Amino acid sequence: TNPNAIVGLTEFMADTKLSRKIELDFGHLFGKWEKQTELIVFNPPWLPASYDPEGNDEAIYYNENLFPDFFEGAKKRLLPEGKLVILFSNLAQITNVTKDHPIEKELTEGGRFQLEKCLKKTVKAASEKTKRDPHWRSSEEVELWVLINI
């Protein structure tokens, strides 16, 4: 519900060929899109919220319904054998915010998708100038999940 991503992408695409092939919509999860597709890419917030996030906090924290709502909506909108590509992180687990991993939970309990692959990349060390405590940074991994509609 923050339009900055749409504004930024619109400016980035400008008058490129992409701008003629991609239609953007500002809305919750799938917005106005109902038509089935072969690919859905999702870059959700990486930390569960302990309160109801608003504004810029929605880019960092997700509420308890985000992932169940997303997976339910994705199932309806993916063609048979269509793919979900999800960018995520183990940040919530290594900082002990939660033990639950929403993508792993969906694969275990949801019965809607099958894992094709999960690629992980270690995050670079934080700058020595940072004031945040980066002791967990060496354990952080960014994850790229590819799930297939079953």
Give a label for each model feature.
Residues T1-F42, P48-A49:
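Conserved SAM/SAH cofactor-binding pocket of Class I
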Residues P3-A5, P44-D69:
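Mobile active-site "lid"/loop adjacent to the S-adenosyl-L-methionine
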Residues T10-E11, D52-G55, V97-K99:
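Short amphipathic alpha-helical segments
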Residues L18, L78-P80:
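Helix-to-beta-strand junctions that scaffold the AdoMet/dcAdoMet cofactor pocket
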Residues W46-L47, S89-I94:
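Short "lid" loop at the C-terminus of a central beta-strand within the Rossmann-like core
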Residues P68, E81-S89:
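Conserved beta-strand signature within the Rossmann-like core of class I S-adenosyl-L-methionine
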Residues F70-A74:
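Class I S-adenosylmethionine-dependent transferase superfamily signal
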Residues I94-I150:
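Class I S-adenosyl-L-methionine
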